[in-house]
Amino acid sequence: MSKLLVFGHQNPDTDAIASSYAFDYLAKKAFDLDTEVVALGDPNEETAFALDYFGVSAPRVVTSAKAEGASHVILTDHNEFPQSISDIREVEVYGIVDHHRVANFETANPLYMRVEPVGSASSIVYRLFKENRVDVPKDIAGMLLSGLISDTLLLKSPTTHASDHRVAAELAELAGVKLEEYGMAMLKAGTNLASKSEAELIDIDAKTFELNGNAVRVAQVNTVDIAEVLERKEAIEAAIREVMASEGYSDFVLMITDIVNSNSEILALGANMDKVEAAFSFKLEDNHAFLAGAVSRKKQVVPQLTESFGA
């Protein structure tokens, strides 16, 4: 077998980078695999903060597994092929570590697959370290903690599993940081949107979902001031229309999430706005609506859209 590439999803967030970085280390130590961690995009500002804080180099970015001479890959923090590497259907998926729904995915051969309904893929990777009795180095503990903090908004998201609180406490101790202090600093580092173009803003954390034959793009940005983001609404909508036309998305849903007050504004465009409105029981006005208490794409947006589009 050629070298195994380990990577998270496209437009990688902190959990995608952290879980793949840590699993690459574990694969070598516990399973004697010849792996290399790579990424399907550059780290965002939140992830860059974590990488810099713990002295970790960002994984190199690749666009094709076969171009790297790899015939087998390991996926972390995703399993759906539309969210993965461009030639995912041309290589063999050796393993998966994920905490999302399983969909748009199939393999010709059996594989190692660890999927749990917890707050982050990083939580699962940490558990794998413990199960295989592999010590967690400080930098890896820090990155795994960062992935968990990011995906659960410092354990405030409804996706947070009861076990995640213990995991976060243990990782914070191993990483030598104060959980709340480090967590808020990292999350705030990811809310600097002023320097982003509208095209960059809608692509910071975006995933494509195949919903009943529709390619639906669901993006999320975190902020401490929703009104400031909505001041750019017209330009954001223009960027959304442009990417919908170029990429063939039927619909685009942008979550603008207030990480302080735990609410989101939904900005949506596309061919199926009736289904979007039905999903959340709201009425879009000028393409947007307020969604109280919504902070999680995985639990509070995608399942609702999936049900509505499937109806």
Curated annotation (Swiss-Prot):
The lineage of its organism: Bacteria, Bacillati, Bacillota, Bacilli, Lactobacillales. It catalyses: diphosphate + H2O = 2 phosphate + H(+). The keyword Transmembrane helix does not apply. It comes from Streptococcus equi subsp. equi (strain 4047). This is Probable manganese-dependent inorganic pyrophosphatase. Its EC number is 3.6.1.1. Mn(2+) 1 binds at residues 9, 13, 77. Binds 2 manganese ions per subunit. GO terms for cellular component: cytoplasm. Keywords: Cytoplasm, Hydrolase, Manganese, Metal-binding. Its cofactor is Mn(2+). HAMAP family: PPase_C. It is found in: Cytoplasm.
